[in-house]
Structures are given as C-alpha cells and as structure tokens.
C-alpha cells in the first residue's frame, strides 16, 4: 500500500474531487509532506496539485490547498502554465474567480507567450473572459505567433464573444499575426460564418487584405470549402474572385490543390472563372494542380466543367506527368482512362518514366510483375 502523501494517490484524489479523503491523507502525512516534493513526480509537465485542481475544476480543493497548505498560486509547470492558465483554458469560472480573488497575475505568460485570456478565448465561455477582462486582462497582448485574444476568438467563431471584445477594446481587431494574417483570414479559413458576418459589420478590414503569401480571406474560404463565406465576402466585402497570391495562383488553383469540388463549381459556374486559367509563375492550370496533388475526384470535376485534358505547363509536362511524378496511381489511371496519352516533356521524358510504384507501372505495362 502506498504511504501517506504518495503523489499518484494525491493526484487521483484531486482529479476525482475527493476533498475529504485528500484532507485526511495530508493530515496523516503531516510534516512529512512538502508541496514542492510533488512537483515533477507526475510526469514531464511538472504540475503541482493546484494545476490539477484548476484543470479539473475542483474549486473547493483549490481553496483548501491554498489556504491550509499555503501552496503558491503562481507556481509554474515546465510549460510556464500557472493554475490560472489551467482554469481559464478549461472554462472553470469558479476556479478562475477564486484565483483572481487571491491575487493571481492576470496576464501571466506561459510557453509561447499565451495569457490566461488567450486560453479562455479557445473556449466559448463568455463569463470567464469577462472575469479576466474585468480584473485587468489586456486583449491586445500577442503571443509568439502574433495572435491576440481577438484572433483566437475569431478562430472559435462565437459572435457574442467577438462583440464583447470589440466593446471593451474597440481597436482589438486592428491586428495581424507575424505572417500578416488577420482575424478575418482566420474566421474565413475555419468556416465561422457568423464570426465573418460580425467582423464585416463591426470592423474595417481592407477588401482582399493579404498575408505574407498573398492569400486573401476569400482564398482561405474557397480552399477550405466554405462557399457560403466566400459568397458573403463577395457580396459584403467586395472581394476579388480572381485575385492572385504571391505565386500567381488564384482561388481556383488553391481549391484544386485541396480538392474542394463544390468551391470549384461555384467559381466556374457561378462566377464565370475560366477553368483553364493559369497561375502566373508556374503556368499550371487547376487540372495540373489537382493531378499534382493526386486529387482524382477534382480532376474528374474539372474535366466535367470543360478543362483541357491536354494542357501542359511551361516545361510541357501534362497532368499525367504530374500525377506520375507524385506516384498517384488512381489519378494517373483516371487520366489515361479519360483519354490522356503519354507524351514527352521538354527534356524528352515520358510520364511513365517518372513512376516508381509497381501499381502505376502495371497500368502502363500489364506485363510488369509485382
């Protein structure tokens, strides 16, 4: 049987919320138990019992450990998380309020410069966010990637939380990450329709604001398959459907890479985008991009929309070359079944010569043995 004060047993009692048993255990251990001896005994995180209590929402145990054993509410684990980070990240309001009431540092930084408010914004718990802000949390602080709390809330997509942050800090939307991505990019990428609506109504982002790669929120919405958001950006934000990124690729090309067939149909049939338009730098069409990524269904969709199956890039490589170079057997097979013949590129190489897998080689030559 484990001796009194055994770290594993104490941890279990805290997680299960067994305050009475925990109190009895520690009273038996008495002077033999040192709170600091617990640190590090529960794995590489270096958590204290306060971390466990805060993480699991055990406010009564949290108060007991602080008041009866004088445990340090600012104790950091190996990720520099304080108990307040744990309580905020899990949405345990009673623990958050207790720690703040005991004087916990509201904007303490964990690894990667995340504050408790940032972590609270990963949860749709407005009351916890309000408690932190009312105790002085700064929504404008940024983590190591350049994200502030509004950025994080935009990813989660709760318009009520976004509205609250804009009310208490009207300039919080004026932010970019280190790669120049705005909260509008983030909300569009993650398919948060109501959040995008809120951002367009309350904030003043430039139409087609670009990140370091030249990607616009419209491109983000399209390449992730969020057609309703793409329509919203077109109607309410005057987004440009043919804008190009830093490599000269349009939203159509990016949708081909990610295999977003519905978005491709919307662009071609709904907006009249040329299905064979080329990216400026690579001269790849959407069909070539899809073949390069092995997106067989998207290749089929593009062909059904009239894409030129014989299109080639600046090195005269066909879709078959790109599919074979990527060892995409199913895609290469579909292209051949659709009538695309093997041909030489500018170096004289055939698509078949780029294959390595037996499955693809057998499609070209049934006599190849497995």
Curated annotation (Swiss-Prot):
Q: Say which domain of life the source belongs to.
A: Eukaryota
Q: Which UniProt keywords apply?
A: ANK repeat, Cytoplasm, Nucleus, Repeat
Q: Name one GO cellular component term.
A: nucleus
The record's section on InterPro entries has: Ankyrin_rpt, Ankyrin_rpt-contain_sf
| BP GO annotations | tRNA modification
What stretches pass through the bilayer?
none
Q: Where is this site: Required to capture Ser that is misactivated by AARS/AlaRS?
A: 111, 144, 174
Record's subcellular location: Cytoplasm; Nucleus
- Which Gene3D superfamilies does this entry report, sorted A to Z? Ankyrin repeat-containing domain
**Record keyword Cytoplasm present:** yes
Asked whether the keyword Repeat is assigned, the reply is yes
Query: PROSITE patterns, alphabetically?
Result: ANK_REP_REGION, ANK_REPEAT
Q: Where are the ANK repeats?
A: 45-75, 79-108, 112-141, 145-174, 179-209, 213-242, 247-277, 282-311, 315-344
Which Pfam families does UniProt cross-reference here?
Ank_2, Ank_4
Quote the subunit structure annotation.
Interacts with AARS; the interaction is direct.
Its function, per the record, reads: Required to prevent the misactivation of serine (Ser) with tRNA(Ala) by promoting the hydrolysis of Ser-mischarged tRNA(Ala), thereby playing a role in translational fidelity. Binds directly to the catalytic domain of AARS/AlaRS and captures Ser that is misactivated by AARS/AlaRS, preventing the charging of Ser adenylates to tRNA(Ala) and precluding Ser misincorporation in nascent peptides.
Any domain commentary?
Side chains of Lys-111, Lys-144 and Lys-174 capture Ser that is misactivated by AARS/AlaRS.
Protein name as annotated: Ankyrin repeat domain-containing protein 16
**Organism, scientific name:** Rattus norvegicus
Q: Which gene encodes it?
A: Ankrd16
């Amino acid at each position: 049987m484990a001796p009194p004060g055994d770290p594993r047993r104490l941890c279990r009692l805290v997680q299960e919320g067994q305050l009475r048993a925990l109190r009895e255990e520690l009273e038996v251990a008495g002077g033999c138990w040192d709170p600091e001896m617990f640190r590090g005994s529960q794995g590489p995180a270096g958590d204290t019992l306060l971390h466990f209590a805060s993480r699991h929402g055990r406010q009564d145990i949290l108060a007991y450990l602080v008041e009866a054993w004088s445990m340090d509410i600012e104790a950091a684990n190996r990720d520099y998380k304080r108990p307040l980070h744990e309580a905020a990240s899990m949405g345990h309001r009673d623990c958050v309020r207790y720690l703040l009431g005991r004087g916990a540092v509201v904007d303490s930084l964990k690894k990667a410069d995340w504050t408790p408010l940032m972590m609270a914004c990963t949860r749709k718990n407005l009351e916890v966010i309000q408690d932190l802000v009312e105790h002085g949390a700064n929504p404008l602080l940024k983590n190591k990637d350049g994200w502030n709390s509004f950025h994080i809330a935009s990813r989660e997509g709760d318009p009520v939380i976004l509205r609250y942050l804009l009310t208490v800090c009207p300039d919080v939307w004026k932010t970019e990450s280190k790669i120049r991505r705005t909260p509008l990019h983030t909300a569009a990428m993650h398919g948060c329709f109501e959040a995008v609506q809120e951002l367009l109504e309350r904030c003043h982002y430039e139409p087609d604001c670009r990140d370091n790669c030249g990607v616009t929120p419209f491109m983000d919405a399209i390449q992730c398959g969020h057609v309703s958001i793409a329509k919203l950006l077109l109607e309410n934000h005057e987004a440009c459907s043919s804008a190009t990124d830093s490599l000269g690729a349009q939203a159509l090309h990016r949708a081909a890479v990610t295999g977003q067939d519905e978005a491709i149909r919307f662009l071609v049939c709904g907006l009249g985008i040329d299905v064979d338009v080329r990216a400026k730098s690579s001269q790849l069409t959407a069909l070539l991009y899809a073949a390069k990524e092995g997106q067989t269904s998207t290749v089929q969709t593009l062909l059904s929309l009239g894409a030129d199956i014989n299109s080639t890039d600046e090195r005269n490589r066909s879709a078959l070359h790109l599919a074979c170079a990527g060892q995409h057997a199913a895609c290469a097979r579909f292209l051949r079944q659709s009538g695309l013949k093997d041909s030489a590129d500018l170096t004289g190489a055939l698509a078949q010569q780029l294959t390595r897998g037996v499955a693809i080689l057998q499609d070209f030559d049934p006599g190849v043995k497995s």
